[in-house]
Amino acid sequence: ECKIKWHVVETESMCQSGQAMTDESLKFFNSISSAQKDLGNIDLLLTSSALQYCPDPIAYLKELLAVSAKYIYITRTPFFPGHQTLVSVQSSMLSQNGPGPLPQGYIDQEILYPISFVPIEQVEALIQEKYTIRFKVLEEPANLFVENQPVNAYYGFFCELK
């Protein structure tokens, strides 16, 4: 039997919403350090479509790597082939964010939020300081171009602690 302890790091408001689902195997935290303190050793750290929405994706990646989880899986994350981080504005409909229908009383409307495309070479170099990249996969080809350069190819990295 394998017991899984799932510690989710999210925004404060998402943590508050998640408290209703909290039990022995699922907990919500608003910081990496508080999740790690509660959990102790971490076998697998998963980040899915999150780094690009952090105010400083590289600093957040460094914080994730410092956890020293046995394995890290970075998935659904767009990277830039250039040498500098490209920051843009992403738009979506409110209903496209989160599972299920909009709560009663909410109006579906366009929302705007910042998104960062960090240089893939910089990310790989940071990872390789502490981890071995076991595989890297192109999950979704670029569909956004600036001056004929792809800026958002989505990659996945599965990494093992050295």
Q: What are the roles of these predicted feature ranges?
A:
Residues E1-S34:
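Class I SAM-dependent methyltransferase SAM/SAH-binding core
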Residues Q109-E139, N152-G156:
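Short alpha-helix
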Residues S68-L94:
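Conserved beta-strand signature within the Rossmann-like core of class I S-adenosyl-L-methionine
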